[in-house]
């Protein structure tokens, strides 16, 4: 969240934020894990058995469309996706990709307190210096 807020404040280019919140129909319901969104961004959900579920076709369409449009134009908006505005200072817009898709403003204000309540805090083993930028150090670790 801090990284997105920093990039939005600098405004060198539009900043878009998303949250993949699909619950997979496996092992009684598994929350999305790291990289579980990749098949949908590449329109390959049908090739990954765990992705075969009700929202799969819709996610293939909108997530791959958003990915291609962002790569082509810098703007992820595409047919089938609600209007997705870029983040700006004080307004962090998050597109939720899941059974339904919705653009939420400042969702982190609702979500982060819940995460902090139920998950122990994470301290990176070697935090980046305060003045570290994205091109050096470990600023990419989040």
Where does each model-flagged region fall?
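C-terminal helix-and-tail extensions that cap enzymatic domains
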Residues: 1-142
């Amino acid at each position: 969240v801090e990284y997105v807020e920093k990039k939005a404040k600098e405004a060198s280019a539009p900043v878009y934020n998303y949250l993949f919140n699909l619950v997979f129909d496996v092992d009684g319901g598994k929350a999305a894990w790291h990289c579980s969104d990749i098949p949908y961004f590449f329109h390959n959900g049908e090739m990954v058995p765990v992705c075969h579920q009700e929202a799969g076709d819709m996610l293939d369409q909108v997530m791959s469309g958003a990915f291609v449009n962002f790569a082509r134009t810098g703007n992820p908006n595409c047919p089938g996706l609600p209007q997705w505005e870029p983040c700006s200072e004080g307004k962090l817009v998050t597109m939720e990709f899941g059974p339904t898709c919705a653009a939420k403003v400042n969702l982190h204000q609702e979500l982060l307190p819940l995460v902090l309540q139920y998950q122990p805090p994470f301290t990176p083993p070697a935090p980046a210096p305060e003045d570290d930028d994205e091109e050096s150090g470990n600023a990419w670790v989040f």
